[in-house]
Design a protein with these regions (language model features):
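Juxtamembrane helix-loop-helix connectors linking adjacent transmembrane helices
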Residues: 1-39, 53, 57
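Transmembrane helix-loop-helix hairpins at the membrane interface
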Residues: 28-122
C-alpha cells in the first residue's frame, strides 16, 4: 500500500500530464518518437515493471491489476483518455502476469500508440 501511495504521489508531484502535453509541439516526427518509443517504454517499466510488481507483493494479482490500471487511467488525466487507459492498463497487466516480463506490455503499448497515431494522421 505504501509503494502504491508513493507512486500516486510521485505522479501528482511530477505533473506528468502537463509534461506530456508540452512535448506535442506540432512536430510530427518528435511526437512520433515520444508517442511510439519513449512513452511505452517509460510507462510500462514504471506501471507494470515497478508499480504492478510492488502492488502484487501486498494484494492479489487481480487487485494489483485493477489498482495499477486505475493509476494508469488517472495518469492520462483526460476523462475519455483515462477510461480508455484504464481498460488498456488491465490488458497490459494481464500481459505482464502471463509473460512475467515487461516486454509484452511494451510491445502491445507501442502497437496501440502506433494504431492511434495512424488513425490520427490519416
Amino acid at each position: 500500500s505504501l509503494a502504491c501511495g508513493l507512486a500516486v504521489r510521485a505522479l501528482q508531484i511530477s505533473g506528468a500530464a502537463l509534461a506530456d502535453e508540452s512535448l506535442f509541439t506540432g512536430n510530427l516526427w518528435l511526437e512520433a518518437v515520444v508517442l511510439l518509443a519513449a512513452s511505452p517504454i517509460l510507462e510500462e517499466y514504471f506501471f507494470r515493471g515497478v508499480l504492478y510488481g510492488r502492488c502484487k507483493e501486498l494484494v492479489s494479482a487481480p487487485a494489483a491489476a485493477f489498482m495499477t490500471a486505475a493509476f494508469f487511467g488517472v495518469f492520462h488525466w483526460d476523462l475519455v483518455q483515462g477510461i480508455y487507459s484504464f481498460f488498456m492498463g488491465l490488458i497490459l497487466a494481464y500481459l505482464m502476469e502471463k509473460t512475467n516480463t515487461v516486454k509484452a506490455p511494451v510491445v502491445f503499448h507501442f502497437a496501440a500508440n502506433l494504431a492511434a497515431l495512424v488513425l490520427e494522421v490519416f
